């Protein structure tokens, strides 16, 4: 098999030329991400590994190999650095209206104090500086800012299916992922924060891949999946979950991550489910 590594996705003309030159042999592209042209070419003899997305395409079939899941979260290689720290700061500022020092915010967000200082300067009127530290001018505004700008946790996801209730599946996956710091998000996370609708899909963030086949799950397509395990590129998820959990071991991601994942997975009443999570967050923020 001939392997071609490209720093940018190939154009349709480059793909056609490389396929001709391979003269019927197997050709493998290693690229940062998939494009429509690469997906189409994967139907006709081209194999593709999209490194940033953790996706392999062979003969038109898409795979997200469990073996490709890193043992620790890592930021995807990109020409543009993702501001994970700024998004984490937005989330922890929404936790309470009580002022906190930059050192306290840095600990909660899992970033450096210098990164906090830089991010606060960019938030302008959304934050207020007082004698005891920094706080959000309005928690709702920060929440909207996060939900409108956050691109997702990235990393590599593996889809699973089981016949148990989604809540039961989530508990089983949490137990299996105890050593990988598994936490809940999406529908099931919302059910633990502000119960409102029956969860349709569980999202689990873990620091390493989980082989859930050992506990009764089957690998699945994204469309049929009842549970997704994701090793995120965003390294701040555990810090913000810890901040919201207080002295307890976190079982659920922070509320804004949960709200984001509800919107990501969708559903006819996703907007209402998010509203219930944010309403609970607002109550806690107002209570200080």
How would you label these PLM feature ranges?
Residues 1-45, 200, 206, 223:
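DNA-contacting interfaces and partner/effector-binding or oligomerization modules
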Residues 42-59:
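Charged, structured surface patches that assemble and position nucleic-acid processing machinery
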Residues 63-79:
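Short, Lys/Arg-enriched N-terminal segment that forms or immediately precedes the first helix
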Residues 81-82, 251:
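Residue-level marker of regulatory loop/turn positions in helix-turn-helix DNA-binding domains and
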Residues 83-147:
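Loop-centered beta-sheet repeat module
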Residues 144, 148-149, 160, 164:
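Electropositive nucleic-acid-contacting surfaces
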Residues 154-236, 241:
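Short gly/ser-rich loop at a beta-strand->alpha-helix junction or flexible surface loop bordering the NTP-binding
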Residues 211-288:
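Hydrophobic alpha-helical interaction segments
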């Amino acid at each position: 098999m001939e392997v071609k590594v490209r720093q940018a996705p190939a154009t349709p003309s480059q793909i056609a030329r490389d396929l001709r030159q391979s003269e019927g042999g197997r050709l493998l592209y290693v690229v940062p991400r998939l494009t429509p042209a690469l997906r189409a070419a994967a139907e006709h003899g081209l194999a593709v590994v999209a490194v940033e997305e953790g996706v392999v395409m062979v003969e038109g079939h898409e795979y997200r190999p469990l073996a490709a899941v890193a043992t620790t979260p890592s930021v995807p290689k990109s020409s543009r650095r993702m501001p994970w720290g700024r998004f984490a700061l937005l989330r922890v500022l929404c936790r309470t209206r009580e002022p906190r020092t930059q050192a306290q915010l840095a600990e909660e967000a899992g970033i450096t104090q210098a990164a906090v200082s830089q991010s606060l300067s960019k938030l302008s009127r959304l934050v207020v500086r007082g004698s005891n530290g920094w706080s959000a001018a309005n928690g709702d505004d920060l929440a909207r800012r996060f939900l409108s700008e956050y691109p997702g946790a990235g990393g590599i996801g593996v889809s699973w299916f089981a016949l148990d209730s989604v809540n039961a599946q989530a508990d089983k996956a949490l137990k299996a992922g105890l050593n990988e710091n598994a936490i809940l998000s999406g529908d099931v996370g919302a059910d633990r924060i502000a119960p409102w609708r029956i969860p349709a899909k569980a999202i689990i963030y873990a620091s390493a891949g989980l082989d859930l086949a050992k506990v009764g799950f089957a690998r699945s397509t994204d469309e049929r999946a009842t549970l997704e395990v994701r090793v995120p590129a965003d390294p701040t998820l555990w810090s913000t979950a810890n901040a919201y959990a207080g002295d307890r071991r976190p079982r659920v991601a922070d509320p804004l991550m949960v709200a984001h994942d509800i919107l990501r997975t969708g559903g006819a009443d996703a907007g209402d489910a998010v509203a219930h999570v944010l309403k609970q967050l607002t109550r806690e923020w107002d209570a200080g």
